[in-house]
Amino acid sequence: AVPPLVQLYGVPPGLEYLAQVGLNSLFLSIYLSGMLTGFETNNQYEIKNSIGQEIYHAKEKSNCFIRNIFGSARGFKMRIKDNMGQEVIQMDRPMRCCLQEIEVQAPPGVTIGYVKQEWSCFFPKFSILDPNNEVLLKIRGPFLPLKCCGDINFEVKGMLDEQSIGRITKQRSGFIKKCISDATNFCIQFPIDMDANMKAVLLGACLLIDIMYFEKGGNLFLKLLKGF
């Protein structure tokens, strides 16, 4: 784990790690979830820098009944703590039937941005917004029925929606890991000089993408509708 950093002017407490010069990527590993039991537990993530040092630990807080009935459609809070055990980021996802979103707060109680899903028939699309709901970035994903074919890239683009300035990558899991759990790994890449708040919001986008598209357990409600 990395040692605590000095508070930086204009950077929310706890986001100093994201404001470091040279930090251009984050890596997420999810703990084993729903292993063998078939029931979804609260997700937990290790968040590391590019040299493998853990800088944050994220833990979901959601209702067990709601989690196992509605699965990836559930609402939740994600509490993110630094290595001192201080909660520095909170993410709030309401339960919605469509066009999902997540609010990112740093410190908890102070909104720094939103991730909002856009309407699209076949391709995942999201907008990254500031606290005033002004769109700053776009995220564009691939045709997801092909998601078993290797690493899956979600491109982070500017307002013109042309050139990529970053990327969220779902890295392919090993066969054994996929058999026993929902364990996944992600890499988030962004410009070195990106604002620390926007890096935190992209982290929220990654967590939302993981739960929306790559979580397999739960969702008993949909199974009942389909007659299992």
Q: What are the roles of these predicted feature ranges?
A:
Residues 90:
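Aromatic (Trp/Tyr) and acidic
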Residues 1-77, 83-86, 94, 99-101, ...:
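Low-complexity or membrane-interfacial segments used for flexible interactions
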